[in-house]
Amino acid sequence: MTQARCPALLIAAPASGQGKTTVTAALARLHARQGRRVRVFKCGPDFLDPMILARASGAPVYQLDLWMVGEAEARRLLARAAGEADLILIEGVMGLFDGNPSAADLARRFGVPVLGVINGAAMAQTFGALAYGLAHFQPDLPFSGVLGNRVGSQRHSDILRDCLPPGMRWFGGLPRSAEFELPSRHLGLVQAEELADLDARLDAAADALRASAETDLPEPVTFEVPAPAPLQRSLEGVRIGVARDASFAFLYQANLDLLRELGAELAFFSPLQDQALPAVDSLYLPGGYPELHLGRLQGNRAMAEAIRAHHAAGKPLLAECGGMLYLLDCLEDADGERGELLGLLPGRARLQKRLTALALQEVELPEGRLRGHTFHHSTLDCAVEPLARGVCPNGRNTAEAVFRLGRLTASYIHFYLPSNPQAAAALLAPARDAD
């Protein structure tokens, strides 16, 4: 097994909402502007943060999760990045030690040093206690130092620095500023494509970081390069239509890469804007925000008829979360506004004010076992008997249904297709290739 070396840093925090994404994006934009090739990863299954980080770095962002992605695939992704980049940045998820697996587990497994980001607003000496806890809760954690976020002044930054334990590295204090705050909504950050001033925000964050913090490259980390695992090109010649617009944008880059590696040609289309489907053998409707675009989705009757005709012809259709909601008879948003949708999956859903499911999921389908995750604010009433139900590896009761009507497969689960390439191919292969 060969090795690849590259400077790397995992940006983590004691909790969500501390500014991990802002700091990671600022670092990525700063180094990219200096001509470095930056590759960014996101711990866990999140879709929204990677959209911001991809814009900041100028390169696709991949998820890293020791369970959903798997250690071997995570190692391959990191080694590939190390072979082509000048800097690897990994944004953590939730708090540093939260979840199973956690961001700390990933840092320890691959020897990536951790930069702790702590929201220093309205805080003084307690900052030092939080920093000490992050560094010492797990003795074998490679910990690089801390950065204060949302700092009120230079004097405030000095106070935070001076309360750190002896020997702990102080990266600096990023000031509080509306110029680079990233807005959010019910599922997380607002999508990158919806922020007209995103590049200005990222540049402002990079400028502020350069003026207030250490931004030198971290020490190189050695990554083992695994032997390549050849894939059978079982989707050779298959054309897959992939919905991608403001309604349906929750797509793992690794899923798209895999489908192409299996031989498929991807044709992207917009259920919001397009009047017809591209000429395709199969359809993939990912998650997103259909509830924010009910009027336009309901009004695009030409697209609705095209998707209904695709299903009636017995062609494969895979729908995840928001894509599944699009297939229902009716979707109602949290304010009571309703939209009549495709009617391919008998049932209705309603958006709630609170989160209704958040869990990793593994499900056994006739095509094979797939892993993924679920994260939604809606409740579903569906008359179809589930084909299967997911299982949460952490013992939670969440067991998302997978529905099957002919070649239509739909679920709240966002599938991580590289967890079983053969199953992914079977779900999307036309009948002539499935025998």
UniProtKB/Swiss-Prot annotation:
Organism: Pseudomonas aeruginosa (strain ATCC 15692 / DSM 22644 / CIP 104116 / JCM 14847 / LMG 12228 / 1C / PRS 101 / PAO1)
InterPro entries reported for this sequence: CbiA/CobB_synth, Class_I_gatase-like, CobQ/CobB/MinD/ParA_Nub-bd_dom, GATase_3, P-loop_NTPase
Catalysed reactions listed for this entry: hydrogenobyrinate + 2 L-glutamine + 2 ATP + 2 H2O = hydrogenobyrinate a,c-diamide + 2 L-glutamate + 2 ADP + 2 phosphate + 2 H(+)
UniProt keyword list: ATP-binding, Cobalamin biosynthesis, Glutamine amidotransferase, Ligase, Magnesium, Nucleotide-binding
Primary gene name: cobB
Assigned EC number: 6.3.5.9
UniProt-recorded name of the protein: Hydrogenobyrinate a,c-diamide synthase
Pathway note: Cofactor biosynthesis; adenosylcobalamin biosynthesis; cob(II)yrinate a,c-diamide from precorrin-2 (aerobic route): step 9/10
Gene3D superfamilies for this protein: 3.40.50.880, P-loop containing nucleotide triphosphate hydrolases
